[in-house]
From Swiss-Prot:
Its EC number is 5.4.2.12. Substrate binds at H117, R146, D147, R177, R183, R251, S252, D253, R254, K324. This is 2,3-bisphosphoglycerate-independent phosphoglycerate mutase. GO terms for biological process: glucose catabolic process; glycolytic process. Monomer. Mn(2+) 2 binds at D13, S63, D430, H431. The gene is gpmI. Mn(2+) 1 binds at D389, H393, H448. The lineage of its organism: Bacteria, Bacillati, Mycoplasmatota, Mycoplasmoidales, Mycoplasmoidaceae. InterPro entries: Alkaline_phosphatase_core_sf, BPG-indep_PGM_N, Metalloenzyme, PGAM_B_sf, Pgm_bpd_ind. HAMAP family: GpmI. GO terms for cellular component: cytosol. It catalyses: (2R)-2-phosphoglycerate = (2R)-3-phosphoglycerate. Transmembrane segments: none annotated.
Length: 502
């Protein structure tokens, strides 16, 4: 199918709409290109959080559910909510867990209230299932500090100690997510976390779990950066062949490297020097390219935007840097890896820096160059610029401003190029972050927000419906109406277009 215009769906990660004050890096950046587009083209403020995209009340959006919702064109029950429904069912009992008897079972999970990658209540549920059959639980904790408050882990100390006593749990290790949940193949980080969890150490931490947890605020930039520590060096609690490891995070992108160190797969080429043979891996939901038994099924999403493009032989390009590559591929396609002859995916390597506030421009210029270089090869471009989110997570206001201005500069180049070459940009965010860097007490916020995001279309022939509240779910139907393509019945959201003038 030949399109009259090329479309660029530009997702600016972590760019929300906030108060116009000094807590808002977007306001302080005063990005000239975005300001120009907002003031001169059809624009709406749309929801990227809470019930409007299938989350809980007051729950912030995130990149996974954001891209999932944009690609699906409908409100989706996310993994957290889906798992909760199973766990709350009186009749539900996991056949997998109930068959584990008289064993040592390792549980790895991020103990957080952020609900982006994990839910600490899921760890509780797994423990309760496991201890029914005379099993010994060895717990490997991951601290957050990124999707939760920077030092939010301290609030869980009493709760974790109560769990230890009630169920005779061994808390063997603690690692910040910076190490345990890397997703950019910085294997030295993942290996360090793995070693603390599963490998015999020459030296263990001289402090107790309680002492370490209480001292994080004085020792680290945030919970995210806690160095992997070992609290128990008893040989019998090191990982052995044929033992079971349960990964209690439901989101796969930041667990796949650790999973690879436990059970190697063809996706990665890194070799674990301390590989334990024949480990039995269990996950909450299926992880792509991971050899594991899943406790719960994921929803099967058909007729996503990518499916529709493929059906109509529309050539699309998916472009993002490493940090967000899974979002414009796996998540955008409904939480599965789909391969179409009509789709080309371009992976732009992320900069190799410790944290992105050290390089706020990231690889944005290479993303833009890739779009322009391949403009005439494709009909539609699905693009993610990661800067406001990845730098916003650092809590560094000035560098987040730089990140926003870097993306704004790239948007200017894209707008000029698309305008000259019969193209239209549709610009949005997947969730808020950079617009809310400080709370009312001027304390740093590193997590996402519940704020709305922009939807901009650079075509003044389009009149958007300003009388209705829309969300990320309405973007796919809007694209299809703009292209005059019938919307599949599975896309239950509606288009935001009121009228297209001749």
């Amino acid at each position: 199918m030949k399109l009259n215009k090329k479309i660029g769906l530009i997702i600016i990660d972590g760019l929300g709409i906030g108060k116009e004050d000094n807590t808002n890096a977007v306001h302080l950046a005063n990005p000239p290109t975005l300001n120009y587009l907002i003031n001169n083209f059809p624009t709406l403020q749309i929801s990227a959080a809470q019930q409007n995209i299938g989350l809980l009340e007051n729950q912030a959006g995130n990149s996974e559910i954001g891209h999932l919702t944009i690609g699906a064109g409908r409100i989706i029950l996310n993994d957290n909510a889906n798992i909760n429904n199973y766990m709350k069912s009186v009749d539900y009992e996991s056949a997998v867990l109930s068959n584990i008897k008289n064993e040592i079972v390792h549980i790895v999970g991020m103990y957080s209230n952020g609900l982006v990658h994990s839910n600490y209540e899921h760890i509780h549920w797994i423990i309760k299932q496991i201890i029914k059959n005379n099993n010994q639980v060895v717990l490997h904790l991951i601290s957050d500090g990124r999707d939760d408050y920077p030092y939010g882990f301290a609030q869980f100390i009493e709760q974790i100690n109560a769990l230890k006593k009630q169920y005779n749990i061994i808390v063997k290790s603690l690692s910040g997510r910076y190490f345990a949940m890397d997703r950019d193949q910085r294997w030295e980080r993942t290996q360090k976390a793995f070693n603390a969890m599963f490998v015999k150490q020459d030296k263990i931490c001289e402090k107790t779990f309680l002492e370490v947890a209480q001292s994080i605020a004085n020792s680290y930039k945030s919970d995210e950066f806690v160095q992997p520590v070992v609290f128990n060096d008893d040989e019998k609690y090191n990982l052995k062949p044929h033992q079971k490891v349960i990964l209690a995070n439901y989101r796969s992108d930041r667990m796949r490297q650790l999973a690879h160190l436990l059970k190697p797969n063809k996706k990665f080429h890194y070799n674990n020097p301390f590989l334990v043979q024949d480990v039995n891996l269990i996950t909450l939901v299926p992880f792509p390219d991971v050899d594991a038994i899943a406790l719960f099924e994921k929803q099967n999403l058909n007729n996503t935007l990518g499916d529709v493009f493929n059906k109509h032989q529309i050539k699309e390009a998916r472009i993002a840097e490493t940090e967000k590559y899974a979002h414009i591929s796996f998540f955008f396609d409904g939480g599965v890896n789909k391969y179409y002859s009509t789709k080309t995916q371009y992976l732009i390597p992320s900069q190799k820096v410790a944290t992105y506030d050290l390089c706020p421009q990231m690889s944005a210029h290479l993303i833009t160059k890739t779009i322009i270089d391949h403009y005439f090869d494709h009909d539609v471009f699905i693009v993610n610029y990661a800067n406001p989110d990845m730098v916003g997570h650092s809590g560094n206001m000035q560098q987040t401003i730089e990140a926003i201005l870097s993306v704004d500069h790239e948007i200017r180049k894209l707008y000029d190029f698309f305008e000259k070459n019969n193209g239209v940009l549709m610009i949005t965010g997947d969730h808020g972050n950079a617009e809310m860097m400080l709370d009312d007490q001027k304390q740093v916020i590193t997590s996402h927000s519940v704020n709305d995001v922009w939807f901009i279309i650079t075509d003044n022939k389009v009149i958007l419906n300003s009388t209705q509240k829309f969300s990320l779910a309405n973007i796919a139907p809007t694209i299809l109406e703009y292209l005059n393509i019938a919307q599949p019945i599975q896309m239950t959201a509606t288009s935001m277009i009121k009228k297209i003038c001749e």
